[in-house]
């Protein structure tokens, strides 16, 4: 699933080299943490969250087949925020 999320997100963004997916496995649930470049955050989320919802729907469908639950968490990169804040001063 990690590779699926990476492939889909890399095709959506302007900075595919900054797409990082971390997989955290639990007993029945797997959390996929997605990090993208700050400027690509809107592309991954989409208007009214439609793109993110579509990715989560694909994960849910694939998870049914594997009898696992997959949660996608889109993480804002802290280092991008810090560099942006330091540039504003």
Where are the language model's segments positioned?
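RNA-contacting regions in translation and RNA-metabolism proteins
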Residues: 1-41, 53-89
């Amino acid at each position: 699933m990690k590779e699926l999320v990476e492939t889909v997100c890399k095709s959506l963004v302007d900075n595919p080299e900054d797409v990082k997916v971390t997989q955290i496995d639990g007993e029945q649930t797997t959390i996929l943490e997605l990090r993208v470049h700050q400027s690509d955050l809107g592309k991954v989320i989409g208007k009214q969250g439609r793109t993110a919802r579509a990715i989560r729907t694909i994960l849910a469908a694939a998870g049914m087949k594997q009898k696992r639950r997959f949660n996608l968490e889109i993480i804002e990169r802290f280092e991008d925020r810090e560099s942006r804040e330091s540039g504003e001063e």
